[in-house]
Every structure is written in structure tokens, then in C-alpha cells.
Amino acid sequence: MNTDNKILYTYENLEKDSEGYLKKTKDWNIKLAEEIAKRENITLSSDHWKVIIFVRKFYFKFNITPSMRMLIKSIQKEIGKSKMNSIYLFKLFPKGPAKQASKIAGIPKPVKCL
């Protein structure tokens, strides 16, 4: 029982689409990201967080979730080509960097993702 009168939000009781993406970006927080990542079998490292924060900033700046191509080009400009290439991003997010990072970041699925 919650005795401090705070509403506890967990992934289960938040509104999501059929694939598990949050419907309301304002519901996202760091703890929720960790919970979603755990469900995706990902242990978040500092590089995961760089990508997650990057896609959130991108979404709120341009009002669109970056596609894979857009993600790679944009993140390489900001973080550097040597590290954030497609091979490395797939190691971080094996089910697809744009798709999986967006889900963990609490933003909509990229339009071009199947």
C-alpha cells in the first residue's frame, strides 16, 4: 500500500500502443527507462544513455522520432563518427537502434520502422 499519497507509475499502468511505446511522452522518467530497457534485455551503459538522451532531444526539437539513417547522421555530428556508427549502435540496441532507443526513451516509434 502506498502511504505517502504519491502515485507510483510503472510500465504496466501507463498508456502504451500495441507495441509497448508510451502514448504520452510526459510519462517518461529515468526509472521507467530502466524498466523498459530491462524488458528489452538491455543493461543501460553510459553510451546507451547518450543515445536515449539524444533521441529525446531530437524528438522534442523537431517533433519527429529519428529514423535509423537520421539517427546515425545526427548522432555522429554531435558525438562523433568514430564511435556512433551503425554497427556499434546495433550492439547497443540489437532490435534496431532507432526503434529500441525510441521505446526506451519514451517517444513514438520512428515512422519508417516496421
Swiss-Prot record:
Job of this protein? Part of a sulfur-relay system required for 2-thiolation of 5-methylaminomethyl-2-thiouridine (mnm(5)s(2)U) at tRNA wobble positions. Could accept sulfur from TusD.
| Example GO BP | tRNA wobble position uridine thiolation
Chief location bin: cytoplasm
Q: What organism does this protein naturally occur in? A: Buchnera aphidicola subsp. Acyrthosiphon pisum (strain APS)
Which cysteines are cross-linked by disulfides?
A: none
Which protein are we looking at?
Sulfurtransferase TusE
Q: Which Gene3D superfamilies match?
A: 3.30.1420.10, DsrC-like protein, C-terminal domain
Q: Which NCBIfam families match?
A: dsrC_tusE_dsvC
Q: What is its EC number?
A: 2.8.1.-
